[in-house]
């Protein structure tokens, strides 16, 4: 998933590849006017405020993804300690997902920090969006922290799975 943004004083253009359902949902609310209050909140202010709202909804979506990862970690823990099942495949898939998301989130943090420095160019003079973007950075930091912890946990599960598999193989070889 990739999102490109172009903005000026009175406009914001987004182009995205892949499935960015939260962004599509936000656009549909504005286009179809299904929630007039939300539409006014999104469209009635500056381009910088709209950019904040877009980034915020995407970061919130990442928080949902992180919660799913934590649930998958719990499932993998059960599999690692189950003698009848192998966890190698699930560990590999989840490690890849965590690594990919970490790369995305670290890039997003740099972009949000840089954007926060240049906000006033695209805001109305009475608008101070610093607190809004600081709040987004706090959420991004929470995602990063959780992903870092998840990565460490995955490494522990990987090592444990390897040790238990090796021990099981050694027992089988000892019997033979």
Each PLM stretch: what is its role?
Residues 138-176:
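Hydrophobic alpha-helical transmembrane segments and their immediately adjacent juxtamembrane loops
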Residues 1-120, 124-125, 135-146, 175:
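Peripheral, non-transmembrane regulatory/ligand-interaction domains of membrane transport proteins
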């Amino acid at each position: 998933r990739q999102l490109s943004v172009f903005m000026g004083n009175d406009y914001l253009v987004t182009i995205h590849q892949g499935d960015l359902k939260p962004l599509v949902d936000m656009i549909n609310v504005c286009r179809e006017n299904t929630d007039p209050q939300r539409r006014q909140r999104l469209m009635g202010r500056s381009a910088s405020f709209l950019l904040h709202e877009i980034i915020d909804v995407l970061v919130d979506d990442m928080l949902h993804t992180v919660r799913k990862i934590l649930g998958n970690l719990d499932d993998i823990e059960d599999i690692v300690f189950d003698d009848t099942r192998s966890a190698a495949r699930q560990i590999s898939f989840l490690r890849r997902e965590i690594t990919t998301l970490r790369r995305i989130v670290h890039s997003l943090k740099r972009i949000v920090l840089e954007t926060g420095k240049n906000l006033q160019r695209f805001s109305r003079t009475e608008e101070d969006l610093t607190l809004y973007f600081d709040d987004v950075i706090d959420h991004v930091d929470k995602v990063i922290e959780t992903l870092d912890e998840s990565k460490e946990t995955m490494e522990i599960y990987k090592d444990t799975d390897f040790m238990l598999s090796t021990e099981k193989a050694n027992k089988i070889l000892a019997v033979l």
